[in-house]
Protein backbone atom coordinates (compact mmCIF):
# COMPACT_ATOMS: atom_id res chain seq x y z
CA UNK A 1 0.00 0.00 0.00
CA UNK A 2 2.77 2.45 0.95
CA UNK A 3 4.75 1.92 -2.24
CA UNK A 4 1.62 2.09 -4.37
CA UNK A 5 0.71 5.40 -2.71
CA UNK A 6 4.13 6.70 -3.81
CA UNK A 7 3.36 5.87 -7.42
CA UNK A 8 5.47 2.71 -7.59
CA UNK A 9 4.71 -0.16 -9.91
CA UNK A 10 4.78 -3.07 -7.45
CA UNK A 11 5.64 -6.63 -8.43
CA UNK A 12 5.11 -9.36 -5.84
CA UNK A 13 6.52 -12.86 -6.09
CA UNK A 14 5.46 -16.31 -4.96
CA UNK A 15 6.81 -19.78 -5.63
CA UNK A 16 3.77 -20.41 -7.81
CA UNK A 17 1.86 -17.21 -8.50
CA UNK A 18 -0.70 -18.97 -10.70
CA UNK A 19 -2.13 -21.02 -7.83
CA UNK A 20 -1.30 -18.77 -4.86
CA UNK A 21 -4.31 -17.13 -3.25
CA UNK A 22 -2.55 -13.88 -2.21
CA UNK A 23 -5.14 -13.60 0.54
CA UNK A 24 -3.47 -10.66 2.28
CA UNK A 25 -3.36 -8.62 -0.93
CA UNK A 26 -7.10 -9.19 -1.28
CA UNK A 27 -7.74 -8.18 2.34
CA UNK A 28 -5.77 -4.99 1.75
CA UNK A 29 -7.74 -4.27 -1.41
CA UNK A 30 -4.65 -4.14 -3.64
CA UNK A 31 -4.79 -7.53 -5.35
CA UNK A 32 -5.48 -6.02 -8.78
CA UNK A 33 -2.85 -3.30 -8.31
CA UNK A 34 0.09 -5.65 -7.77
CA UNK A 35 1.63 -7.70 -10.57
CA UNK A 36 2.17 -11.29 -9.38
CA UNK A 37 5.04 -13.41 -10.70
CA UNK A 38 6.52 -16.81 -9.87
CA UNK A 39 10.05 -16.89 -8.45
CA UNK A 40 11.93 -19.54 -6.53
CA UNK A 41 14.19 -17.44 -4.31
CA UNK A 42 16.36 -20.49 -3.64
CA UNK A 43 17.18 -20.78 -7.34
CA UNK A 44 19.72 -18.35 -8.80
CA UNK A 45 18.50 -18.64 -12.38
CA UNK A 46 14.91 -17.93 -11.36
CA UNK A 47 15.87 -14.77 -9.47
CA UNK A 48 18.39 -13.62 -12.09
CA UNK A 49 15.90 -14.02 -14.94
CA UNK A 50 13.18 -12.13 -13.05
CA UNK A 51 15.54 -9.21 -12.41
CA UNK A 52 16.58 -9.09 -16.07
CA UNK A 53 12.98 -9.24 -17.30
CA UNK A 54 11.37 -6.72 -14.93
CA UNK A 55 14.40 -4.48 -14.27
CA UNK A 56 13.43 -3.32 -10.77
CA UNK A 57 14.96 -0.23 -9.18
CA UNK A 58 14.38 -1.60 -5.69
CA UNK A 59 13.98 -5.09 -4.22
CA UNK A 60 12.42 -5.78 -0.83
CA UNK A 61 13.09 -9.27 0.51
CA UNK A 62 10.29 -10.10 2.95
CA UNK A 63 10.26 -13.82 2.18
CA UNK A 64 11.38 -16.77 4.25
CA UNK A 65 10.31 -18.88 7.17
CA UNK A 66 9.14 -16.62 9.97
CA UNK A 67 8.58 -18.73 13.09
CA UNK A 68 11.19 -19.21 15.82
CA UNK A 69 9.53 -22.36 17.16
CA UNK A 70 9.12 -23.84 13.67
CA UNK A 71 12.80 -23.20 12.95
CA UNK A 72 13.74 -25.81 15.57
CA UNK A 73 11.54 -28.35 13.78
CA UNK A 74 12.71 -27.31 10.30
CA UNK A 75 16.19 -25.77 10.70
CA UNK A 76 17.22 -26.48 7.11
CA UNK A 77 14.16 -24.62 5.83
CA UNK A 78 15.25 -21.61 7.91
CA UNK A 79 18.74 -21.60 6.42
CA UNK A 80 17.55 -22.12 2.85
CA UNK A 81 14.65 -19.66 2.87
CA UNK A 82 16.51 -16.90 4.73
CA UNK A 83 20.31 -17.15 4.46
CA UNK A 84 20.61 -18.95 1.13
CA UNK A 85 17.82 -16.92 -0.47
CA UNK A 86 19.42 -13.64 0.63
CA UNK A 87 22.76 -14.69 -0.85
CA UNK A 88 21.12 -15.71 -4.12
CA UNK A 89 19.30 -12.38 -4.45
CA UNK A 90 22.45 -10.40 -3.67
CA UNK A 91 24.50 -12.41 -6.14
CA UNK A 92 21.81 -12.12 -8.81
CA UNK A 93 21.72 -8.34 -8.41
CA UNK A 94 25.50 -8.17 -8.69
CA UNK A 95 25.54 -10.46 -11.73
CA UNK A 96 23.08 -8.32 -13.69
CA UNK A 97 25.40 -5.33 -13.38
CA UNK A 98 22.43 -3.10 -12.59
CA UNK A 99 22.25 -0.58 -9.73
CA UNK A 100 19.39 -1.86 -7.57
CA UNK A 101 18.57 -0.87 -4.01
CA UNK A 102 18.05 -3.93 -1.83
CA UNK A 103 16.25 -4.12 1.51
CA UNK A 104 16.39 -7.29 3.61
CA UNK A 105 13.95 -7.85 6.47
CA UNK A 106 16.05 -8.62 9.53
CA UNK A 107 14.95 -9.65 13.01
CA UNK A 108 15.53 -8.83 16.67
CA UNK A 109 16.10 -12.58 17.08
CA UNK A 110 19.65 -11.83 15.88
CA UNK A 111 20.30 -10.41 19.34
CA UNK A 112 19.09 -13.49 21.20
CA UNK A 113 19.43 -13.30 24.96
CA UNK A 114 20.33 -9.73 25.98
CA UNK A 115 19.90 -10.38 29.72
CA UNK A 116 16.81 -8.15 29.80
CA UNK A 117 18.73 -5.17 28.39
CA UNK A 118 17.17 -3.29 25.44
CA UNK A 119 18.86 -4.01 22.12
CA UNK A 120 19.94 -1.44 19.55
CA UNK A 121 22.28 -1.29 16.55
CA UNK A 122 25.33 -1.47 18.82
CA UNK A 123 24.21 -4.64 20.62
CA UNK A 124 26.21 -7.75 19.76
CA UNK A 125 24.44 -10.61 18.02
CA UNK A 126 23.85 -13.73 20.10
CA UNK A 127 21.13 -15.68 18.24
CA UNK A 128 19.59 -18.63 20.10
CA UNK A 129 17.51 -20.32 17.39
CA UNK A 130 17.98 -21.55 13.81
CA UNK A 131 15.74 -18.66 12.76
CA UNK A 132 17.89 -16.11 14.58
CA UNK A 133 21.10 -17.65 13.24
CA UNK A 134 19.69 -17.52 9.69
CA UNK A 135 18.72 -13.87 10.06
CA UNK A 136 22.11 -12.98 11.56
CA UNK A 137 23.88 -14.73 8.68
CA UNK A 138 21.74 -12.85 6.16
CA UNK A 139 22.54 -9.58 7.93
CA UNK A 140 26.28 -10.16 7.58
CA UNK A 141 25.92 -11.18 3.94
CA UNK A 142 24.11 -7.93 3.17
CA UNK A 143 26.78 -5.93 5.00
CA UNK A 144 29.57 -7.77 3.18
CA UNK A 145 28.05 -7.17 -0.26
CA UNK A 146 27.38 -3.51 0.59
CA UNK A 147 30.99 -2.94 1.63
CA UNK A 148 32.50 -4.93 -1.23
CA UNK A 149 30.37 -3.66 -4.12
CA UNK A 150 29.47 -0.20 -2.75
CA UNK A 151 25.77 -0.60 -3.45
CA UNK A 152 22.69 0.39 -1.48
CA UNK A 153 22.09 -2.89 0.33
CA UNK A 154 20.60 -2.67 3.82
CA UNK A 155 18.87 -4.69 6.55
CA UNK A 156 16.02 -3.40 8.68
CA UNK A 157 16.10 -5.09 12.09
CA UNK A 158 12.43 -5.70 12.85
CA UNK A 159 11.09 -6.34 16.32
CA UNK A 160 7.73 -8.00 16.95
CA UNK A 161 5.02 -6.16 15.08
CA UNK A 162 1.34 -6.94 15.05
CA UNK A 163 -1.28 -6.98 12.33
CA UNK A 164 -4.74 -8.47 11.75
CA UNK A 165 -3.10 -10.24 8.79
CA UNK A 166 -0.73 -12.23 11.00
CA UNK A 167 -1.15 -16.04 10.84
CA UNK A 168 -3.17 -17.68 13.61
CA UNK A 169 -0.20 -19.72 14.87
CA UNK A 170 1.31 -16.58 16.45
CA UNK A 171 0.50 -15.87 20.09
CA UNK A 172 -1.61 -12.73 19.77
CA UNK A 173 -3.80 -14.25 17.06
CA UNK A 174 -3.98 -17.47 19.06
CA UNK A 175 -5.24 -15.55 22.11
CA UNK A 176 -7.80 -13.57 20.10
CA UNK A 177 -9.11 -16.62 18.24
CA UNK A 178 -9.40 -18.67 21.45
CA UNK A 179 -11.24 -15.85 23.24
CA UNK A 180 -13.75 -15.79 20.39
CA UNK A 181 -14.20 -19.55 20.69
CA UNK A 182 -14.66 -19.29 24.46
CA UNK A 183 -17.27 -16.58 23.94
CA UNK A 184 -19.06 -18.76 21.39
CA UNK A 185 -18.92 -21.76 23.73
CA UNK A 186 -16.76 -23.98 21.52
CA UNK A 187 -13.73 -23.74 23.85
CA UNK A 188 -13.36 -23.27 27.58
CA UNK A 189 -9.58 -22.97 28.03
CA UNK A 190 -6.69 -21.07 26.50
CA UNK A 191 -3.46 -23.06 26.21
CA UNK A 192 -0.17 -21.19 25.82
CA UNK A 193 3.46 -22.26 25.69
CA UNK A 194 6.16 -20.44 27.64
CA UNK A 195 4.38 -17.67 29.55
CA UNK A 196 7.68 -16.35 30.95
CA UNK A 197 8.75 -15.01 27.55
CA UNK A 198 8.78 -11.21 27.32
CA UNK A 199 8.23 -9.33 24.07
CA UNK A 200 7.70 -5.76 22.91
CA UNK A 201 5.14 -5.30 20.16
CA UNK A 202 4.77 -2.65 17.51
CA UNK A 203 1.95 -2.23 15.00
Predicted regions and their residues:
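N-terminal Rossmann-like NAD(P)+-binding domain of SDR-like oxidoreductases, especially those catalyzing
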Residues: 1-161
